[in-house]
Amino acid sequence: MTVKGKRITVHDMTLRDGMHPKRHQMTLDQMKAVATGLDAAGVPLIEVTHGDGLGGASVNYGFPAHTDEEYLGTVIPLLKLAKVSALLIPGIGTVDHLRMAKDLGVHTIRVATHCTEADVSEQHISLARQLEMDTVGFLMMAHKADSQRLISQARLMESYGANCIYITDSAGYMLPAEVKEKTSAVRAALRPETELGFHGHHNLAMGVANSVVAVESGATRIDAAAAGLGAGAGNTPMEVFIAVCNRMGIATGVDLFKMQDVAEDIVVPMMDHPIRIDRDALILGYAGVYSSFLLFAKRAEKKYGVSAREILIELGRRGMVGGQEDMIEDAAMTMAKARGPI
C-alpha cells in the first residue's frame, strides 16, 4: 500500500524499555529531562514504568531506583501535549496497579502476554476499557507463533475490549518478510476500527526496516526509543525512524531536529554502556531470545565462566520466554557443571 500522507502515532519506549539497560535505575531528574524533551519534540505517547511494567520491582526482575508511582507522578504533570502509557504484564502487574495508573493520569494501558497466552489478559483488558482507557493488547515474542495463531490471539484480545493490538518482536528476530506477512494477516482479521501496532528491537539491525514494513502493512502505531535506548541492542531508534518517515511522506508530527537533540544531548549521556549490536545482542536476534535477557546472561557469564552468547543460544534452544529470568542462572550453572568443577 502507498504510505505517502499516512499519519501514524509514534510511541516512545525510552523511559520503559530503556529501563532494562539502565538496570531500572533511572533518576527522577533523568525521567523529567527525557519526558519534557520528547514532549517538546512532538512525541504524542510516552511509556513510563519499570522495564517489566507495573509491579515489576522484584528480586526476579530488579528493584528500580523509584516506584512506578513516583516515576508516573513526576512525569505526567510536566507534559503539555504528550500522553503517558504504562505496560502491564498479567502475573507481574495487577488490577490494583492498573487502577493506580489510571488515578495518576495514565492514558494508555498496554496489557502484554506471550503471543500464545492472550487468554490471561481478559481481566486486565476488560477493566481498562471499563475505566475508559486507551487499551492495547501486546503480543510478545511474535516470532514464536505463525500468522493464524497470532490472528486467534489478537481476536481474543480484541474481544476482551482492546482497541489496538501490537505485534511485538521482543527478540529482534523477525525479518521484513515475516513482519509483512504477520502484520498484514492480523490487520485483515481485526475490525477496521481496531488499530494495529508494531514494536521492534534492533538486534539484527532490522528495527527501522521492520517498522516501515509494518506501516506499509497497515500498522498505525510504532514503538521506538530515543537513541534506541532499550533492551538488547535497543529498540527502533526514534530519530532514525522519524527521518525515514519524513523521506517517505509518513506523517508523525515529530520534529526531527528536536528528536535528534533529545537522543544526542540527553539520552546518550545517560547510557551506562553503548547501546549497540555487540556479539551478545546479535545472538538475541539470531537465536530468537527475549531481549531483556541480555544483562542477565552477561551477569551469569561473570559468575559461572560460560560466555553470555553460549548461554543465550542455550536459552533459545530451550525456548525460554519473558518471565523465566530466574532460569537463566540455572541454565548457566548447568552448562558450567557440564564442563567440570565451578
Swiss-Prot record:
It comes from Albidiferax ferrireducens (strain ATCC BAA-621 / DSM 15236 / T118) (Rhodoferax ferrireducens). Transmembrane segments: none annotated. One of its GO terms (molecular function) is 4-hydroxy-2-oxovalerate aldolase activity. This is 4-hydroxy-2-oxovalerate aldolase. Coiled coil: none annotated. Substrate binds at residues 16-17, 170, 199, 290. Residues 8-260 form the Pyruvate carboxyltransferase domain. Mn(2+) binds at residues 17, 199, 201. The active site is at 20 (proton acceptor). Belongs to the 4-hydroxy-2-oxovalerate aldolase family. Pfam families: DmpG_comm, HMGL-like.
